[in-house]
């Protein structure tokens, strides 16, 4: 197997296959569940809006893919600074049966100089999650400034995040190697049990390999696993399957 095919295989096993569109329906989520059970193995998770968790759970059980985790989003996509609402949404997501919750950090508050709200929001949402995995989306493409990306990562980890994630996929700039370098460095300094999730903008096996390479250089080859590394993506899967000669070439897309 070539290095590119190896990267494609790994990226599938590390993927949160995502649909977070305004026109999502039960049928689209059922299709996503089937798609997550690929000829190259299952993706790590699917990521969907909370209201679709029950139908996703039913579908994954029916197709024998119970090991695929169900992730959902809260305080999404704008990263508002109302802690009470973020906590209510997170509690509701857990009640729906989410295995993982991706919450958006109040990044605009941080840009305005307020570090407290972000820390307190993540801390409260982690308490609401209990054993459910909490991934914190810092929206690195909007923060832009390396110092802000670093600070959002530090605050999230200090507040109890299980993962830090680059992006919502709803802004012009999503995952970049530069943001990955900063965020993975913070993980190496603070807590190597915390995971990293580049989301949006990873289009093919070559780009996936670049992100994996940064993680391995900073944290070591043994660090990367579904417990510590995920790709958030929708259009990436078809490209990876094509690399593995398991699907036709994907059509050009503007998708996440």
UniProtKB/Swiss-Prot annotation:
The keyword Acetylation is assigned to this record: no
EC number annotated for this UniProt entry: 4.1.2.4
Spans traversing the lipid bilayer: none
Gene Ontology terms for molecular function: deoxyribose-phosphate aldolase activity
Compartments (UniProt record): Cytoplasm
Database matches in InterPro entries: Aldolase_TIM, DeoC, DeoC/FbaB/LacD_aldolase, DeoC_typeII
Entry GO terms, CC: cytoplasm
Catalysed conversion reaction: 2-deoxy-D-ribose 5-phosphate = D-glyceraldehyde 3-phosphate + acetaldehyde
Pathway per the UniProt entry: Carbohydrate degradation; 2-deoxy-D-ribose 1-phosphate degradation; D-glyceraldehyde 3-phosphate and acetaldehyde from 2-deoxy-alpha-D-ribose 1-phosphate: step 2/2
Keywords: Cytoplasm, Lyase, Schiff base
Entry annotation: catalytic residues: 102, 165, 197
Keyword Lyase: yes
EC top class named in words: lyase
UniProt record, GO biological process: 2-deoxyribose 1-phosphate catabolic process; carbohydrate catabolic process; deoxyribonucleotide catabolic process
Function text: Catalyzes a reversible aldol reaction between acetaldehyde and D-glyceraldehyde 3-phosphate to generate 2-deoxy-D-ribose 5-phosphate.
NCBIfam families according to UniProt: deoC
HAMAP family, per the entry: DeoC_type2 (MF_00592)
Family designation: Belongs to the DeoC/FbaB aldolase family. DeoC type 2 subfamily.
Protein name per the record: Deoxyribose-phosphate aldolase
């Amino acid at each position: 197997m070539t290095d590119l095919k190896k990267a494609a295989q790994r990226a599938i096993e590390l993927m949160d296959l995502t649909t977070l569109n305004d026109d999502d329906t039960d049928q689209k989520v059922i299709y996503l569940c089937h798609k997550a059970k690929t000829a190259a193995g299952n993706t790590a998770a699917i990521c969907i809006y909370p209201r679709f968790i029950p139908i996703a759970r039913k579908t994954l059980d029916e197709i024998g893919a119970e090991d695929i985790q169900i992730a959902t989003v809260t305080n999404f996509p704008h990263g508002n600074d109302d802690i009470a609402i973020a906590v209510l949404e997170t509690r509701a997501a857990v009640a729906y049966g989410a295995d993982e919750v991706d919450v958006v950090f109040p990044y605009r508050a941080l840009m305005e100089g307020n570090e407290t709200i972000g820390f307190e929001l993540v801390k409260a949402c982690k308490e609401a999650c209990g054993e459910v995995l909490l991934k914190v989306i810092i929206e690195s493409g909007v923060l832009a400034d390396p110092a802000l990306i670093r600070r959002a990562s530090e605050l999230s980890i200090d507040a109890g995040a299980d993962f830090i994630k680059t992006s919502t996929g709803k802004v012009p700039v999503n995952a970049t190697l530069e943001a990955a370098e900063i965020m993975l460095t913070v993980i190496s300094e603070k807590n190597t049990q915390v995971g990293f999730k580049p989301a949006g903008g990873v289009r093919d096996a070559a780009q996936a390999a670049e992100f994996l390479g940064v993680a391995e250089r900073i944290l070591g080859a043994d660090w990367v696993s579904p417990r510590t590394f995920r790709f958030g993506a929708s259009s990436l899967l078809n490209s990876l399957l094509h690399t593995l000669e398991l699907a036709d070439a994907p059509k050009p897309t503007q998708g996440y």
